[in-house]
Amino acid sequence: MVAHLTRRNELGSGFARVEYVIECKHQSKPWVLFGRGRPIAGAARVAQRITNPRARSRLYALASRKDIQSQPLFALRKERAYGMTVVTFRDDSGVDVPYAAAMTVVKAAVSLAKRMDVDKVSRFFLALPVIVTDAPLFMCALNTSGELTLRRIQVADLLWRHGVSGHPYSIIRIVHRDALEAWSLSATQDAAAILPLLDPDGVAT
């Protein structure tokens, strides 16, 4: 599933687009995300995103700008993790569902980004992986006293160390079904705010 916001060039030379690539997973067993205490640098939050190859150098150049780093689209939530799993690790089919969902959604985002260059219609394409699930979500992390805590959450960012995206981290937004409506609204606003900065010559469509 995909949802996107597009900005077209008035001269007809293609478009810029922010596209949310969404993988939906139904599972009754809880998912546990393992918390990460230190955020990655502001420039890395921008640069380590999935974009079409011919726009990658532009994204790297933009990553050093503070006005780009401060955009909500590139912000990481306080609830951020470096790994996740289902409580029983495997479902009845023997599949690690959270891992499979992460792999599927990142591969889909990379494939869409590459296709934009093949079709030669996109000047700037940004693909953001999102996993939506009805599985109860929990964050497991150390508190300031060094004690292990477990708490229920609705939305988190997964900084997944897997090379499939071509970056040190694949940044994936994890959203519980109950938070989907609120997230959808903010995601639309975030995309609308960033597009004029990514592609100042275009017009929103």
Show which residues each predicted segment covers.
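Intrinsically disordered, low-complexity Ser/Thr/Pro/Gly-rich regulatory segments
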Residues: A3-T205
